[in-house]
Amino acid sequence: MSKNVVIIGTQWGDEGKGKVVDLITDKVASVVRFQGGHNAGHTLVINGKTTILHLIPSGILRNHVECLIGHGVVLSMSALLKEIAELEVADIDTTKRLKISPGCPLILPYHIELDNAREIKRGKAAIGTTGNGIGPAYEDKVARRGLRVSDLLDPNLFASKLKEVMEYHNFFLTHYYNANPVDYQTTLDEVLSQVEQTKHMIVDVTEQIHQHIANDENILFEGAQGALLDIDQGTYPFVTSSNTTSGAAVTGSGIGVTDIDYVLGIVKAYTTRVGGGPFPTELIYDVALDKGDEIGKVLGTVGHEFGATTGRQRRCGWLDMVTLKRSFNLNAVTGICLTKLDVMDTLETIKICTSYEIDGVETTIPPFSAEDYAKAKPIYIKIPGWKTSTIGTDSFDSLPVEAQSYIRKIEQLANLPVDILSTGPDRLQTLILKHPFE
């Protein structure tokens, strides 16, 4: 019997979702992206070769897998074509297996200009967006003025709609942000030339998904970013512009709620965050100044904690079970995939945050506001480190006893099983204790 599995990052993104998606797609007919845009990077390492994807589902490296981009994704045609070209250079064919929903909102040049103009105007209060136009594109969608992939199929209608919406946005760019306007004709010509290269990929993705279900075929739904960046449930306003929880798989693809059989929550063995926002367990280290917390330095250096999309340094800290337990509930997580355990191989002692102290009161419930988060002081339990390499370990029993204890403690605190364990960046450096599709 087939299964529909959702993979979700349970923290602030960068948990290692791409590798895990690629690994378990050996058993699927299709992989579906359902939210976000090209603001997130999924890094895959196969036989030592690194591939970074931003828009295209991570199943593209499997020749038998169909890759679907659902209507919940905001789509930059420029970014998509760039990614396709990079894959073709690596002899990975996308033309027959990549499909795009006509309902995808388009990211256009004025969205990017607005994104960057806003960050400049915010100054020190900048959110830390990737500057790729994701937020403004989602705003247009909600305001019902956004252009969608389906609009491109009628060039005359698209030209008319584009002119109207560009007049609106150029007014704000010039009069409020003191920025340069975006040229209408240049934008129109660029986008219409791009659609000729992608027209054959546009299909009814929702119908495609239900055909797979009718044919009793496995489907994997690939989340981007992390649940704690969710526009509604995250650390607002330091969040992304889409819903990043497992529920977005339903709204962003068209699968029914009761059709989801399993949710795999990806958990990094420590915590990272890019950009601004609350981070109670942060171990502050500035890579440019080579100054700050030494363990924060180890986690960032050994873990190569630099963004796949922006190259920005990721903030690092201890595992935070307060936020994680909320995330597990939000996503109805079935099982955990624990990643980057090997990054902590050299540490003498490891800490896990199990509660916060806020205004002198201990709590295991995460605060609602960013202001209260800023006052949260982490309360830790300590676990002995294992001080030996776990890279490429081929069985759970082969792990150091202390590493096993760390994993068991996470399972105990989460009340969930660790079904997959990543012990290195390569596809093969993974222990599947229970396969989500079995």
From Swiss-Prot:
SUPFAM superfamilies: P-loop containing nucleoside triphosphate hydrolases. Plays an important role in the de novo pathway of purine nucleotide biosynthesis. Catalyzes the first committed step in the biosynthesis of AMP from IMP. This is Adenylosuccinate synthetase. InterPro entries: Adenylosuccin_syn_GTP-bd, Adenylosuccin_syn_Lys_AS, Adenylosuccinate_synth_dom1, Adenylosuccinate_synth_dom2, Adenylosuccinate_synth_dom3, Adenylosuccinate_synthetase, P-loop_NTPase. Homodimer. It is an enzyme of class 6 (ligase). It catalyses: IMP + L-aspartate + GTP = N(6)-(1,2-dicarboxyethyl)-AMP + GDP + phosphate + 2 H(+). GTP binds at residues 13-19, 41-43, 314, 340-342, 422-424. Mg(2+) binds at residues 14, 41. Pathway: Purine metabolism; AMP biosynthesis via de novo pathway; AMP from IMP: step 1/2. It comes from Ruthia magnifica subsp. Calyptogena magnifica. One of its GO terms (biological process) is IMP metabolic process. Its main location: cytoplasm. It comes from the Bacteria. GO terms for cellular component: cytoplasm. Its EC number is 6.3.4.4. NCBIfam families: PRK01117.1, purA. CDD domains: AdSS (cd03108). The lineage of its organism: Bacteria, Pseudomonadati, Pseudomonadota, Gammaproteobacteria, Candidatus Pseudothioglobaceae. SMART domains: Adenylsucc_synt. Keywords: Cytoplasm, GTP-binding, Ligase, Magnesium, Metal-binding, Nucleotide-binding, Purine biosynthesis. Substrate binds at residues 308-314. Binds 1 Mg(2+) ion per subunit. IMP binds at residues 14-17, 39-42, 130, 144, 225, 240, 312. GO terms for molecular function: adenylosuccinate synthase activity; GTP binding; magnesium ion binding. PANTHER family: ADENYLOSUCCINATE SYNTHETASE.
